[in-house]
A protein has these predicted regions:
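Hydrophobic transmembrane alpha-helix bundles
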Residues: 50, 119-130, 144-153, 176-193, ...
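Terminal helices and disordered tails flanking the catalytic cores of nucleotide-processing hydrolases
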Residues: 1-94, 107, 253-380
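Acidic/His-rich, divalent-metal-binding segments that scaffold phosphate/diphosphate chemistry
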Residues: 53-203
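Alpha-helical scaffolding flanking metal-ion-dependent phosphate/phosphodiester catalytic sites
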Residues: 150-161, 167, 176-189, 193, ...
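Surface-exposed loop/turn and secondary-structure junction residues enriched for glycine/proline
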Residues: 12, 18, 22, 30, ...
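Short hydrophobic/aromatic segments of transmembrane alpha-helices and their interfaces
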Residues: 22, 142, 229-230
Length: 380
């Protein structure tokens, strides 16, 4: 199977997994053969479904795509966030962190199942997963992984709790600041007097990290908190990286609330937009030779993030340096730019090649995801 975006679907494509709406209702089952009318409806009529789908195509039969966290857990957690069910959010934070621990999930490699109607909730789930994986790489305990997962799920709780216009009405005049600056403040305001805080189910570590997750390492974040203070807020620096990573990964750039520095915007505009490769390059530049006055992220967090994140997601179609077209089959920790691929068109068609370990293909590399329409109409 491979992952196709909505605009790349073709009549005759066979769904490898069901298509769900944001409430978990299956619209089409696995095994359904897509027709022109199916595809037209998926493109025009459904705003509450994923932008990406798993389909079976010739040559990809042996590729099995499993998201790090199953769709059932994602949907259940998203519904809890949307309905402001804090008890259920706490329970799902344990489910997610335990899956990451027990299934030895160590890489950030999931195709984005987010859709336009539930951006806020899916963003929260993604930030929680990425934060937990980074923290696991850094050696945090099981209890700490539960806490940081919960912090990720709740970090934008105010956005799911109130409309943007109501947030501005309530707080902009009071704090004299932008909406994106007050969201952490408002989230903590909503949570701090609940029984969950009084009983310790939502800890002070969680609250303080939510409050400071927009702070930069150079002290130039929204609240201008110095780095030495941020370090006292246990998970804030991890949430900061995960939050920006997932926001940049979102195709709907209008949803971005983060004021990116000019050098980041320049990088993305000059190098083809916010592709996974460019996003990782952005973090690597911050991790590299920059002065403390320019650094936005904790370098230790970025080091572990870069080790864990996959540049090329499993199941996505990519172009190789020799011109062949392949589908990513597997990623390797610490070698995210050299995955194992299954070649589906070109001189090496039919071969499965481990670009990390196979010494016969040291000169072969992945250039980028396939974007050209003609490469999606291959003669199989």
């Amino acid at each position: 199977m491979e992952i196709k975006s909505r605009d790349k679907l073709e009549p005759g494509d066979v769904l490898a997994k069901p298509i769900y709406n944001s409430n978990g209702v299956a619209l089409l089952p696995a095994g359904a053969v897509l027709s022109e009318s199916n595809i037209d409806r998926l493109r025009k009529d459904y705003n509450d479904i994923s932008e990406f789908f798993c389909v079976d195509t010739p040559g990809t039969e042996n590729i099995i795509i499993e998201d790090n966290i199953g769709e059932e857990v994602r949907i259940k957690t998203s519904i809890a966030i949307r309905n402001k069910q804090i008890r259920e959010i706490i329970e799902q934070s344990k489910v997610i962190s335990h899956q990451i621990i027990n299934y030895n999930i160590h890489d950030v490699d999931f195709y984005d199942t987010r859709n336009k109607s539930d951006y806020v909730t899916r963003h929260a789930v993604n930030v929680a997963i990425v934060s937990c994986i980074i923290a696991k790489s850094m050696g945090y305990s099981e209890k700490e992984l539960e806490e940081i997962t919960l912090a990720g799920l709740l970090h934008d709780f105010a956005r799911s709790n109130q409309s943007d216009s109501n947030i501005e009405k309530l707080y902009t005049d009071r704090l004299k600041c932008k909406k994106e600056e007050i969201l952490p403040y408002l989230t903590v305001d909503l949570l701090k007097d609940t029984d969950f805080v009084r009983t310790g189910e939502i800890s002070q570590n969680v609250l303080s990290s939510i409050l400071c997750h927009h702070e930069h390492q150079n002290g130039q974040g929204y609240y201008k908190v110095p780095a030495e203070i941020i370090k006292k807020h246990k998970y804030a620096s991890i949430l900061h990286v995960a939050d920006i990573y997932d926001t940049l990964s979102n195709n709907d750039t209008k949803s971005i609330l983060i004021d990116l520095p000019e050098n980041a915007l320049y990088l993305f505009n000059r190098s083809g937009g916010m592709t996974p490769k460019n996003i990782i390059t952005y973090f690597m530049k911050d991790y590299g030779a920059v002065s403390e006055s320019q650094r936005l992220f904790d370098p230790t967090v970025v080091k572990h993030f870069i080790k864990c994140v996959s540049i090329y997601s499993k199941g996505r179609r990519v172009k190789l340096s020799n011109g062949d077209i392949a589908v990513v089959n597997r990623n390797f920790l610490g070698h995210s730019d050299r995955p194992e691929v299954v070649v589906i068109d070109g001189t090496l068609k039919g071969k499965t090649i481990n670009l990390t370990e196979n010494v016969n293909y040291l000169n072969l590399s992945v250039i980028d995801y396939v974007h050209d329409e003609k490469d999606y109409k291959l003669k199989m």
